[in-house]
Design a protein with these regions (language model features):
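Primarily recognizes the serine-hydrolase "nucleophile elbow" in alpha/beta-hydrolase
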Residues: 154-158, 162-208
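Short beta-strand/loop motif that positions the catalytic acidic residue
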Residues: 228, 234-236, 240
Length: 287
């Protein structure tokens, strides 16, 4: 009888040990899977960041643009030999020129239509495609993109005094617009749906990842603001799901000057501000 009790007790101990071992094994497997998922997410962010940030459409070099307003096609070569393509719209007896940096998707086939707004307000317009967009070619890097923005500004500067230059940036283009405005002295800077930095946006979306060490395209727009001396107009919609309103407000608040204005568009999204009266009336007044 005693031997039977001893055997039963031993069996219970063995079963308990097996359960503990199985639990440890399951926990180990779970941790292993979670670490692999975490590593995979880090890898996706690091290796595919260009695909997440830039959404270009490519055009053949033979593509013929068709626009409502008359234009010339401009081609520049960067310091590293990249081919850069832009459209230059000219208005007779213009008041000046709008240098326009567009958003992160599409190409000049679509973005060229935006020139009509400014041409109707008696401005010339120069709008370009970034590397890998439309007919523009070349290896991307944050440094190259800022250098390209500078090259386009210098092109405009050959034909206009800075008092006649309006720099306009939209979405990702706001960081390039702020960059050239900080290095030069245009008449005015207009930022539509701007962001504090790409790093700040990425952190807000992937707060559980070491984004600072993964992101090459940090685009620190805020770093340029203190060197800007011209008036700056900010436009941002409260329903912007791509670049949240608080990103634009944070950039606005970081700009220590009395030559700034924030136009908040209630219910405005990321791609429809030009359909709101607050935007169109303000643009006409500013230009």
């Amino acid at each position: 009888m005693q031997q039977s009790i001893w055997v039963n007790g031993l069996n219970r101990k063995i079963k308990l040990q097996i359960r503990k071992m199985n639990l440890k094994k399951k926990l180990f497997i779970l941790v292993f899977i979670l670490l692999n998922i975490y590593g995979l997410l880090c890898g996706v962010i690091y290796f595919f960041q260009e695909n997440l940030i830039f959404m270009p459409s490519v055009l053949s070099q033979e593509h013929v643009f068709e626009m409502k307003s008359s234009f010339d096609e401009i081609n520049l070569k960067s310091s590293d030999g990249a081919h850069l393509n832009g459209l230059y719209f000219k208005k007779e007896n213009s008041k000046g020129v709008v240098l326009y940096f567009h958003g992160n998707a599409g190409n000049l086939k679509d973005w060229g239509q935006i020139a009509d707004l400014f041409v109707d307000l008696d401005y010339d317009v120069l709008i370009m495609d970034y590397r890998g967009y439309g007919k523009s070619k070349g290896e991307k890097s944050m440094e190259f993109l800022y250098e390209d923005a500078e090259l386009w500004y210098e092109f405009v500067q050959q034909n206009y005094s800075e008092s006649k230059i309006i720099v306009y940036g939209r979405s990702i283009g706001t960081t390039f617009a702020a960059y050239v405005a900080a290095k030069h002295g245009p008449n005015k800077l207009i930022l539509e749906a701007p962001f504090y930095s790409m790093l700040a946006i990425a952190k807000s979306r992937f707060s559980f990842l070491p984004i600072r060490y993964l992101l090459d395209y940090k685009f620190p727009t805020y770093q340029f603001m203190d060197d800007i001396n011209c008036p700056v107009i900010f436009y941002h919609g409260t329903y912007d799901k791509v670049i949240p309103y608080d990103q634009g407000k944070k950039l606005y608040d970081s700009f220590n000057t009395d030559k700034k204005e924030l136009i908040t568009i209630p219910m405005g999204g990321h791609n429809n501000l030009n359909s709101f009266k607050e935007y169109t009336e303000s643009i006409r007044l500013e230009l």
